[in-house]
Amino acid sequence: MKLIKPLTCALALAMSGMAFADVTVSVPDDVSVLAANGEKAKLSGGFFASEKALTLPDGVNQVVFRYAPYFNQGNDRLSVESDVIVARFDTANAELTIEVPKYRNMRDAEENIKDLDWKLVDGSGKAVAVDQDKLIKPGMQIGRDYVREIEDYNRAGGTAAVAFAGAATMQPVTLPAKIPEDMKQARATAVKADSTAEEMLHFWYQKADAETKARFKAYINQQ
């Protein structure tokens, strides 16, 4: 009886450790984690720490990040940014590290960072299997909403896409067999408004000179 109690406690502790095991990812200071599992990433470690840590649950995880190494040029400190990387991996109870290349200088980075040769390695230095892709957004890059972008990416089913439980799903809508009178009136009002808008277009078109009519036709043809 005295032996059973300690064994039971030890078993309970072991089971508890298994149930709450997680994945820790060490992140270098020049890597910015922009989203994790469809949400804004929460990293531990101080602002000036050489490495920070991202804690994730066991199983399939998705991390969105960018690598931006800094270089000294005279009195200036300049960075070169990689594209935004989407990485999906499946691990459990592991300590991982994002390994990124070290470039000799700014020119070396500018020539090679677009084809970023990075790895996710475990505690023994062995590379973990990763599905990866790039999260590309044309045009202005300032103020990007990465959580929204990765939501759209996952919905589109990209190479490193993940379906999260919190993702919004379309619910079926049952339409009434008989359209209520107020809906009929609203529809009639909308049709009337469309008709009025069309009449006004005709009116102003007839009033316009030849040059304005030509510009209007060109605009319509482009739509």
Curated annotation (Swiss-Prot):
Residues 1-21 form the signal peptide. The keyword Plastid does not apply. Belongs to the UPF0319 family. The keyword Signal applies. This is UPF0319 protein VPA1584. Pfam families: DUF2057. Keywords: Signal.
